[in-house]
Amino acid sequence: MALVKAKPTSPGRRFVVTVRNKELHAGAPYEPLVEKKTRKGGRNNTGRITTRHRGGGHKQRYRVIDFRRDKDGVPGQVERLEYDPNRSANIALVLYRDGERRYIIAPRGVSAGTEIVSGVDAPIKPGNALPLRNIPVGTQVHCVELRPGKGAQLARSAGANAQLVAREGRYATVRLRSGEMRQVLAECKATVGEVGNSEHALRSLGKAGAKRHKGIRPTVRGVAMNPVDHPHGGGEGRTSGGRHPVSPWGVPTKGHKTRSNKRTDKFIVRRRKR
């Protein structure tokens, strides 16, 4: 895996930096694990925009990922690594001994031919999934569940990891990349190691069109809008907005806390760093 800087043969190529991974499968995905994906353009069922800056982009198909890792005790072998347009991490196609194939998030250090397994007796090596109560304290993990059997929810993107820092009674404490320390039920599963493709953060799309290919539309500044559209809008000539930065709905955007889920506050041991 290497970063490749494009030659400036045109203005659109001048700033392009891509990640080249020769281990990735060049062909089509495994068809039984591919589903149709309908684009919503950021709209909900009433047709109103609920997520801004979405729309257009290349047609994509969804790869069904095994986030539960519930095939306990059945060894599997990684057949190949693949690109997934739906996430920053790469995915691995695993062939299990009973003949079933599943996609998993590709951990760092896992390649074609690597043996993986899940379950309480799984060895502590990258790619193996087991409950937090069976993982040694200090181990780096990813794809961490928040509820047993629900499937991985934490540390799933490229280069992500969490560290198991303590275990007491029914709960284990994990430290996330954000600095947040959180208690999770020790029965929840996690995968050993960190997510691969960490170079994803270093790439540069190089031009606006590449963003559009991904289905991301432009972000318009509030000061460039009219007063009816944004609190920073309007004024004669160019203005600074005239107030502290806020969202289109008047919520402060710099340093203002917006977390409102009080029900799970008790599980957060330490807040994330600002």
UniProtKB/Swiss-Prot annotation:
It comes from the Bacteria. GO terms for biological process: cytoplasmic translation. SMART domains: Ribosomal_L2 (SM01383), Ribosomal_L2_C (SM01382). GO terms for molecular function: rRNA binding; structural constituent of ribosome; transferase activity. Residues 50-59 have a biased composition (Basic residues). InterPro entries: NA-bd_OB-fold (IPR012340), Rib_uL2_dom2 (IPR014722), Ribosomal_uL2 (IPR002171), Ribosomal_uL2_bac/org-type (IPR005880), Ribosomal_uL2_C (IPR022669), Ribosomal_uL2_CS (IPR022671), Ribosomal_uL2_dom3 (IPR014726), Ribosomal_uL2_RNA-bd_dom (IPR022666). One of its GO terms (cellular component) is large ribosomal subunit. Residues 38-59, 223-274 are annotated as: Disordered. It holds the Pfam family Ribosomal_L2_C. SUPFAM superfamilies: Nucleic acid-binding proteins, Translation proteins SH3-like domain. Keywords: Ribonucleoprotein, Ribosomal protein, RNA-binding, rRNA-binding. One of the primary rRNA binding proteins. Required for association of the 30S and 50S subunits to form the 70S ribosome, for tRNA binding and peptide bond formation. It has been suggested to have peptidyltransferase activity; this is somewhat controversial. Makes several contacts with the 16S rRNA in the 70S ribosome. NCBIfam families: rplB_bact. Part of the 50S ribosomal subunit. Forms a bridge to the 30S subunit in the 70S ribosome. Belongs to the universal ribosomal protein uL2 family. This is Large ribosomal subunit protein uL2.
